[in-house]
Amino acid sequence: MSLASRGLVRVIRAYQRELSPRKPSPTCRFIPTCSQYAVEAIERHGALKGGWLATWRIMRCNPLVPGGVDPVPERFPQGRKTHP
C-alpha cells in the first residue's frame, strides 16, 4: 500500500475510533458503513481510485437513496461512466 493510501486509511481509522462513536445514532444507510467502505476501497484500489469510490459512496449516503448492501467492487469500473 502506498504512503498516500496508508495516510488516508489512518485518517479514516481515527474518525472511526474518535468521532463516529460520539454520534447520537448510526447514520449510514449502507452495509458496510461508508467509512469501512472507504478503507476497503483504498486498500483494494489505491488512494486515487479508492478515494473516488469512497467519495461517490458518501455522496449517495442520503435520504433519497434506499441504501442496503453495497460492497467495494473487485475491479475499478472502466469505460465512459462518470461514476461507479
Curated annotation (Swiss-Prot):
Arranged from A to Z, the UniProt key words for this protein are: Cell membrane, Membrane
Q: Where in the cell is it found?
A: Cell membrane
Q: Which GO terms describe its cellular component?
A: plasma membrane
The record's annotation in InterPro entries points to: Membr_insert_effic_factor_YidD
Fetch the SMART domains from UniProt: Haemolytic (SM01234)
What is the recorded membrane topology of this protein? Peripheral membrane protein
Q: Briefly, what is this protein's role?
A: Could be involved in insertion of integral membrane proteins into the membrane.
**Cross-referenced PANTHER family, in alphabetical order?**
MEMBRANE PROTEIN INSERTION EFFICIENCY FACTOR-RELATED (PTHR33383:SF1)
Family to which this protein belongs: Belongs to the UPF0161 family.
Q: What is this protein called?
A: Putative membrane protein insertion efficiency factor
Query: What organism does the record attribute this protein to?
Result: Deinococcus deserti (strain DSM 17065 / CIP 109153 / LMG 22923 / VCD115)
Q: What is the lineage of its organism?
A: Bacteria, Thermotogati, Deinococcota, Deinococci, Deinococcales
